[in-house]
Amino acid sequence: MSTDWKRSIKLLRNNLRKQGLPVYWHKNSPHTYEVWQHGIMLVFYRRYCDSYTEFVEWLPNTKLPEYIGLKAIPDEGTLCKEEKRLRPFLEAVAFLLVLPLLPKHFVAGADMTGLQTKRRSAYYIKRILGDYSRRGFARLEFLVWKKYILGWEMRLLHKDELAMLKSLWKKVKKKPSTLVYDKKGDCEDFHEWLEEQGIRSIAPVRKGARRGRIRRKLMRNFPQKTYNKRNRNENVNYVFKNRYGDSLSAYSLKGRRAEIATKIVAYNLWARLSALLHELFNIAGNATHF
């Protein structure tokens, strides 16, 4: 556990430094905490706790303050405020954690999932108030390679999946050579948009389809083996929601975007640590055979 924590702290601190993160936000502040310490605490909070209060109570009983040189335990309001401030830096770190692992050519998949924004039970609302409460959902589009999240886009109001993908596409630092999508991606304009960028587009064609040069090519010879890699999206959606929750605790849009960014940093960080652990086990296993 301590080794994983030290590795994760080192990775996070190095990537935060690459973003030009200042040591302190203000010259005249008390200088109790350095900015990078808040970033690391927020990632650990999203990994191990469900609320700021729980994290503040959990933190003194761990080795984390010693590992990051913490002078005092921050309060809940400070952590909440810092998460919103650090959002652009954390969004960049989420991709920098994966960037060194990406090959020159790779297959990525995109898919949309939903996160609940209201935790009230419709049953009890009906029972007490006599009226049903409309459930709120945030739409979250993921771009995935293997078990890593390369990009994401969140919307609280309805927006088309392909339009969301085009929005997040601008923020992706390294584009895939092939993109797989479900039947929602069966659109000739969408295929042509990717082809203009030199990217191969794969999506199952709907029954009765006749039009479209790229769609007809997919009907004649559909690359099923490559398309099966889209199952990784379902795995990532399940693992992410199972580990970090299927709902958003923040109430404002700014807070929700910051919450998603921190959770994705934590997800990519521990996915990379687990991959490193498997690699070390394989090296040790191969060494025993010689």
PLM feature segments, named:
Residues Y52-I68:
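DNA-recognition alpha helix
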Residues P223-F290:
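Basic, amphipathic alpha-helical segments enriched in Lys/Arg and hydrophobic/aromatic residues
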Residues T53, E57, K81, Y238:
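DNA-binding alpha-helical recognition surfaces that contact promoter or target DNA
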Residues T178, K183-S249:
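Helix-centered, glycine/charged polyanion-binding patches within enzymatic domains
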Residues S2-R47:
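Basic, short loop/linker segments at the boundary and entry of helix-turn-helix/winged-helix-like folds
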Residues P65-E66, L101-L102, V172, P223-K225:
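Short hydrophobic "helix-edge" motifs at membrane interfaces and signal-peptide entry regions
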Residues S29-W36, V43-R47, C80-K84, P88-E196, ...:
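Polybasic low-complexity intrinsically disordered regions
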